[in-house]
C-alpha cells in the first residue's frame, strides 16, 4: 500500500521503468523510522476518500459502509493487497534484467492495461464483499422456502396466479403463549369393589374410630345399614342361627320418617329377593304346569251355561275346599293343608303369568267401565 501511494504521488510524465526503479529504491533504502510511521489503511470499498470539516458535516450520523463489511472480507482483501505488492516487487526485479523499454506509446498502453487490471481487482473484491454480506444476513430465506420463480411457468389461468400472490403477501404473526402451571384438585372417583388397604385418616381428637373393622368403609354416599347387611349375608349363606343381631334405633321417629321408609323398603326388597319356599308333600301332587293346561271344550261349554259355585253356597268351609279342589283336579286327602297349598300356588302362577295379564287387560278395554257401587260389591269378600 505504501508503494501504491508513492506511485500515485509521482508526476504523470514519468515512465514505467522509472516508476518501478523509484519504487524499489524507495522501499529498499527507506529508513527504519519511516517504515514504522507507515500504517496500512483498513480495507475500504471505495478507491477515493476525502475529509470534510466539522462545520460542513451534517448533524445526522450516517454509518460508513465499512461497518457492514465482515472480518472475513477484510482479511481476504488484506491478503490480496499484500500478494499484489509482492507480485509488483517480483515484476520490478525481473524488468531490471530485461533490455530497455520501447517507445513512449507502448508505455502508455501498458499503464492503461495496469489500470484496467486494478479496476477488475476492485470489482472482484466488491463482489466478494457483497456475496459475503448476503450470506451473513440474518433475514435470508431458509432452505426449502417458497420461491415464486419456481411456479411462474405453470400453465394456469390468471385467477390461479393471483392466488399464488397471497403466499408472498402473507406475513405470519408470532404469538407467544403464556404457559402457567395452575394447581387443581382432581375429581374423586370412588373405586367400588377394591380391597380395603386400611389407609385411614385419623380423627383430629386422636380417638380410634375402628373404620374398616367395626364399621364398613364404603366409598359411597349412600351407606348401607349394618342390620340389613347382616340379614342379606345370613340369607345368602343360609345361616339363620345368628345369635347376635345389631338393631338400629331411630331417635325421634316422628321427625325422621325418611329413615323408617328406607328401613321398610330395604326389608321388603330382602323378602322379594328370597326364593319361594319348597314344600315336601307327603302324598303325590300334580305339577303346576299340568294344572294350568286348558280344560276340554265340553267342560268350557258347560261352564258357559252353569256358573262356578261362589262363597254364597250353603255349605261349610271344608266342603267348599273339597268342591273347588275337585273342579281344579287337585287331589284332597285327610289333611287339606297340602291341597290348599297347591291351590294357592296355582292361583299365584295365574296371577303372575304374562299371558293371562295381557288377556285380562284386553277384556277390560273391551268391556265398558262398571259403576263404582258394582265394583265395590264385586271386590267385597264376606267371611262367615
Curated annotation (Swiss-Prot):
Residues 87-99 have a biased composition (Basic and acidic residues). Residues 52-151, 358-384 are annotated as: Disordered. GO terms for biological process: cilium assembly; determination of ventral identity; intraciliary transport; pronephros development; retina development in camera-type eye. Forms part of a complex involved in intraflagellar transport (IFT), the bi-directional movement of particles required for the assembly, maintenance and functioning of primary cilia. Plays a role in early embryonic development. It comes from the Eukaryota. Residues 110-138 have a biased composition (Acidic residues). The gene is ift46. Residues 358-374 have a biased composition (Polar residues). One of its GO terms (cellular component) is cytoplasm. It holds the Pfam family IFT46_B_C. Keywords: Cell projection, Cilium, Cytoplasm, Cytoskeleton. Disruption phenotype: Individuals display a number of developmental defects, including dorsalization and formation of ectopic tail. It is found in: Cytoplasm, Cytoskeleton, Cilium basal body; Cell projection, Cilium. Belongs to the IFT46 family. It comes from Danio rerio (Zebrafish). This is Intraflagellar transport protein 46 homolog. Its main location: cytoplasm. Signal peptide: none annotated.
